[in-house]
């Protein structure tokens, strides 16, 4: 039987949440793009609520480990609604330049609205680019630092994403990648699953986004451990790679130097 794709009006992709006929998990790039478009209106508030504001600390650590400094030209990959790009902007100041890249129009629209509401002059140094992390529209060796928050786990081809990051980084520069930690400690991974099943998904279901947040647990299961992420970075050609567990082991950060 031919594959049946259901579309809901005004959505950018197939019907995934609240859809009785939903059959496959969020596998393709366009399904993931549709998911992030759908959750954009509530994404920031849910992150604050679900992490009790802790994600702000993890994002600050990510920026600090990227080595970004005043005057730098930096890239925030999979920038979503812009949290990390705004932090980078304060770091590189008005004579620096920040590019926030994402493939979700809705997330970028939230980022751009937030930028307009901010009063600090440095925030004018941010440019939002709609693009694909797997095919970056930048020349080789362009950036002094790159950050990526909760992005690598969500791209369909992690190897290509890391190769693209390496390509657009200057020699000696760093990428700092924040994400959920796929822990090898059974106590930590059970606690993470417990939080997702009993807090994250029930809260999200109150916004009609149960299926979209269920994807989170599957994506962590299919992600790489810290050791595997270090290996991936070295395999694609980074000269060094170090993984740090943070947030009590729930989160992790990969720092790799070109
Ligand atoms: C930062 C959070 C979520 C980001 C996020 C990432 C994704 O890839 C998604 C994909 C699809 C849908 C949504 C998302 C998404 O929102 C929130 C993280 C919340 C944690 C699961 C729970 C944190 C629990 C504690 C309150 C933290 C305690 C820390 C302490 C130091 C032990
Ligand atoms: C969980 S959000 C993280 C947003 C933000 N970095 C943060 O930390 O809050 C993941 C983001 O990755 C983006 N994304 C996933 N795959 C992508 C790809 N191939 N190219 C560009 N953006 C992508 C999604 O659109 C989404 O905005």
Label the model's feature ranges.
Residues 30, 120-122, 178-236, 242:
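C-terminal alpha-helical "lid/dimerization" subdomain adjacent to the S-adenosyl-L-methionine
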Residues 52-73, 83, 87:
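Conserved alpha-helix/loop element of class I SAM-dependent methyltransferases that forms part
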Residues 2-44:
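N-terminal, positively charged/glycine-rich alpha-helical extensions of SAM-dependent methyltransferases
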Residues 236-258:
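Core SAM-dependent methyltransferase catalytic element
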Residues 43, 146-147:
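Hydrophobic beta-strand segment of the Class I
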Residues 73-136:
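Class I SAM-dependent methyltransferase SAM/SAH-binding core
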Residues 103, 157, 180:
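Short beta->alpha hinge that forms the Motif I/post-I loop of the SAM-binding pocket
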Residues 159-174:
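A short glycine-rich, Lys/Arg-flanked "PGG" loop and its adjoining helix->strand segment in the class I
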């Amino acid at each position: 039987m031919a594959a049946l794709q259901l579309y809901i009006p005004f959505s950018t992709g197939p019907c995934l949440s609240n859809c009785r006929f939903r059959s496959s998990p969020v596998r393709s790039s366009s399904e993931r793009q549709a998911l992030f478009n759908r959750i954009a209106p509530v994404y920031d508030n849910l992150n604050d609520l679900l992490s009790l504001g802790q994600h702000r600390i993890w994002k600050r650590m990510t920026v600090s480990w990227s080595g970004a400094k005043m005057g730098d030209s930096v890239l925030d990959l999979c920038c979503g609604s812009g949290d990390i790009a705004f932090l980078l902007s304060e770091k590189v100041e008005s004579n620096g330049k920040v590019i926030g890249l994402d493939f979700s129009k809705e997330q970028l629209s939230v980022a751009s609205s937030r930028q307009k509401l901010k009063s600090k002059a440095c925030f004018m140094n941010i440019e939002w680019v709609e693009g694909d992390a797997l095919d970056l529209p930048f020349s080789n060796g362009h950036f002094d630092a790159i950050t990526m928050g909760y992005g690598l786990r969500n791209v369909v081809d992690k190897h290509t994403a890391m190769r693209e990051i390496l390509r657009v980084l200057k020699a000696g520069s760093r990428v700092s990648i924040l994400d959920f930690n796929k822990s090898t400690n059974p106590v930590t991974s059970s606690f993470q699953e417990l939080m997702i099943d009993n807090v994250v998904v029930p809260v999200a279901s109150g916004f009609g986004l149960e299926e979209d947040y269920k994807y989170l647990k599957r994506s962590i299961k299919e992600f790489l451990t810290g050791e595997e992420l270090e290996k991936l970075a070295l395999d694609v050609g980074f000269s060094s790679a170090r993984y740090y567990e943070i947030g009590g082991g729930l989160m992790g950060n990969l720092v790799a130097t070109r």
